[in-house]
């Protein structure tokens, strides 16, 4: 059984995300899902012995410890060896934790669908290019560090905004949009693809 630890950044969408994962099975078995607030310690997260980690959406900026708590430490200390999916703030935190820059989006977006162009790999494997994705954010990755590939973008008034990143060496994938939103056409596919990668990583 796959043990999934969700780091909750105090977001109303966290349990929608948990529900999406709870609907999935890996090799016929349901997931063992543990949710912990970002006020947990790194040792608490480590002691849960996760096979996979999800970093939830949340308010605030990844540079502020009060906003992200243990999130950045999880990304740099545990996600180097444990498959991790970051969502919204999870992407921003990953980019920031590995030396990138987070800035303001051209305009705050809360609950609008935009087409996502992606590379067809990782969490995007087999998904339609240009599928609609629900955006709920005012921050974006403005400078992505070299250790990440940009895996997805969306066009916002002629400007390409980062919608997905994938670490080149570690099993970290992140999306800026919300796969658990009803506005996202392939959200279940993103979740399934992540779990497929987790299962393969677990066997390796």
UniProtKB/Swiss-Prot annotation:
CDD domains: GATase1_Anthranilate_Synthase (cd01743). Heterotetramer consisting of two non-identical subunits: a beta subunit (TrpG) and a large alpha subunit (TrpE). Disulfide bonds: none annotated. It catalyses: chorismate + L-glutamine = anthranilate + pyruvate + L-glutamate + H(+). Keywords: Amino-acid biosynthesis, Aromatic amino acid biosynthesis, Glutamine amidotransferase, Lyase, Tryptophan biosynthesis. GO terms for cellular component: cytosol. The gene is trpG. GO terms for molecular function: anthranilate synthase activity. L-glutamine binds at residues 58-60, 138-139. PROSITE patterns: GATASE_TYPE_1 (PS51273). It comes from Haloferax volcanii (strain ATCC 29605 / DSM 3757 / JCM 8879 / NBRC 14742 / NCIMB 2012 / VKM B-1768 / DS2). Part of a heterotetrameric complex that catalyzes the two-step biosynthesis of anthranilate, an intermediate in the biosynthesis of L-tryptophan. In the first step, the glutamine-binding beta subunit (TrpG) of anthranilate synthase (AS) provides the glutamine amidotransferase activity which generates ammonia as a substrate that, along with chorismate, is used in the second step, catalyzed by the large alpha subunit of AS (TrpE) to produce anthranilate. In the absence of TrpG, TrpE can synthesize anthranilate directly from chorismate and high concentrations of ammonia. GO terms for biological process: L-tryptophan biosynthetic process. This is Anthranilate synthase component 2. Its EC number is 4.1.3.27. Residues 3-204 form the Glutamine amidotransferase type-1 domain. Pathway: Amino-acid biosynthesis; L-tryptophan biosynthesis; L-tryptophan from chorismate: step 1/5. The active site is at 88 (nucleophile), 178 (for gatase activity), 180 (for gatase activity).
